[in-house]
Each structure stands twice: as C-alpha cells, then as structure tokens.
Amino acid sequence: MLEERGIKPEKRAECSADLAVAANIPESYIASAEQRMYIYRRIALIRAEAEADDLIDELIDRFGDLPPSVNALIQVALLRGEAGRAGIRDISQKSGKLIFVLEDFDMEKISLLYAQPEYKGRLKVEAGSVPRVSLRLLPRSRPLDEARKFVLSFSLQRSE
C-alpha cells in the first residue's frame, strides 16, 4: 500500500535475541494465564521506545510496579526492534560474549566500530557460513545493556 503512494516501506530484518536474562511475566504479577499470554503478545510487538513506555504505563496502572523480569522482557523486545531496524538478524550470548549476526555484512562499518575506544580489543569478526561479529563482555557487565549499546553504535554507523 505504501509503495502505491510512492513511499518505500521501512526495510527491517526480524531479530531474535537469546540472552542470559531473567525475562518473563511471573504468575504473582499477572495471575490469569490468558492475560499473561495477551501481555506476552503485546510485548512481542514492541519496536520503539514510545511503545515500550506506553505499555509500561499501562501495566503499572493495571497490575502495579513492574517486577524486574517483566522490565527485562520489555527491554529485550525493544532491543529486538532496534536491532531489526539496524539490520541485525540475531543476537546471542555464549561463553562471555555477545554474538551479532548481520543482515548485510559491511566490513567498513565494522571497522568504524573497531576504532571506538569502548570496543577496542573486544570486537571480533567471525568468518563462517554466516559471518558474525562478537563482542567480549567485560566482567560484571550487563549483557542486555551491552547489546543495546552495540546496536545503537552500529545503527549510527549505518546511517552515516
């Protein structure tokens, strides 16, 4: 429909995320299984900060303060949306590192990230059937926060 009006739809990869983060809706927060499933579906649709903020406000109004695991679930959904817009297909955490699979592998953009002080000595390109970039986690770093920082840095490189 957008193409008929001469507007190109936003090209976005779907991103999956597998991080070592406690991200769920506990029964003690939302007792009804039906309501929990409905909220899980709503969270899965989050793609932007404003959508996350609106849902957080609604959840607080309906069920009270968010448990950390619900907040983490929303942050993972937001990460997936941001990463998809940045052209990242998959984010996983293994053996003290985050692994990012890119939709379009562009070594020039990766090189620009290598030059940033916070990534010096921590980024590595892994060749294989699916090229990927890994980011070594620092001790006591939070994987979700590190993933969001990388996605933001990567998306800024993509827009230049």
Identify the function of each model-found stretch.
Residues M1-E160:
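Accessory helical-bundle/CTD segments and flexible terminal tails appended to RecA-like ATPase motors
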